[in-house]
Regions:
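Class I S-adenosyl-L-methionine-dependent methyltransferase catalytic core
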Residues: 1-281
Length: 281
């Protein structure tokens, strides 16, 4: 089923947690002169028009990126993140997907491997990534991202940051995420794997972090950002999470310095809060 379109949700609270984490991870990777690969299993369109019909229909960005842009004082890393977004977006009414953020952060020597199965989003992704220079840096494939990831491991430079963020419209996505991580770690155990997931009332969502901890019990970071109390009918996403296997050593401290303020800014009611836990060797 390919019904999910991120254009309806671009720039929302979940994007803030996901993209801020991705920003911190890639900035860390850039500290070393050695090249790396960025692999995105569910890339989406790359860029989104916040003035378009999809974004305006739901207006989720108004409780996400719009609130961060309006904030007076932000912690250092969060302020740098928001400033970087303003620099890399071609127009004021646009918001980036993970691939566009990554192309701005990766260097000429790094490689990007992007997967998107949805035919319409794939065309948009292709067109948007044509703007990237040098062109040889980016490869876009209309293919299953789970299979595509495994086919690329281990990457030639033996350094990689991987983002896995399926829509989780179907229960099988939860199982596939767990399985692809098991397979990926067998082929490339030192990669940095970032998994985004929605915080929902459904059992699969609530159990996913514990399932991921079983895969990497000694080297992970787990962060959640809840923006409101779960609805009594159990409907809808009240937050989202990032689970990072082999996280940069600085990431826990950076998130600890920024998540309290991010949670405060994006709070929709008194039930807003964040979760942060990590375990490293």
């Amino acid at each position: 089923m390919l019904s999910y379109r991120h254009a309806f949700h671009a720039g929302n609270h979940a994007d803030m947690l996901k993209h801020f984490t991705l920003f911190l991870v890639l900035e860390y990777f850039n500290r070393k002169d050695k090249p790396y690969w960025y692999i995105d299993t569910h890339s989406g369109a790359g860029l989104y028009d916040l003035s378009g019909d999809e974004a305006q229909k739901v207006g989720e960005y108004k409780q996400g990126i719009a609130l961060l842009e309006q904030a007076d004082k932000l912690p250092a890393e969060l302020a740098e993140f928001v400033g970087r977004l303003k620099q890399i977006l071609p127009r004021d009414n646009l918001y980036c997907g993970s691939p566009w953020l990554a192309q701005a952060l990766t260097r000429d020597s790094d490689k990007m491997r992007l997967f998107e199965l949805h035919p319409a989003d794939f065309v948009h992704l292709q067109n948007n990534m044509r703007e990237v220079r040098p062109a040889r840096k980016v490869q876009v494939s209309q293919a299953d991202g789970y299979q595509g990831l495994i086919s690329l491991l281990p990457p030639p430079p033996r350094r990689a940051a991987v983002l896995i963020d399926p829509p989780y419209e179907e229960k099988q996505d939860y199982r596939r995420v767990v399985q692809v991580l098991k397979d990926a770690l067998k082929r490339f155990e030192t990669g940095c794997y970032m998994v985004w997931y929605p915080c929902l009332s459904r059992e699969e969502s609530r159990k996913l972090p514990d399932e991921l901890k079983k895969i990497a019990p000694d080297n992970y970071l787990h962060a959640e950002l809840h923006v409101h109390t779960p609805h009594s009918d159990g409907f809808g996403m009240h937050g989202s999470g990032m689970f990072v296997i082999n996280p940069p050593y600085m990431l826990a401290e950076q998130l600890q310095n920024n998540l309290p303020e991010l949670s405060k800014i994006l709070a929709q009611d008194a039930g807003a809060h964040y979760v942060l836990e990590s375990k490293t060797k």
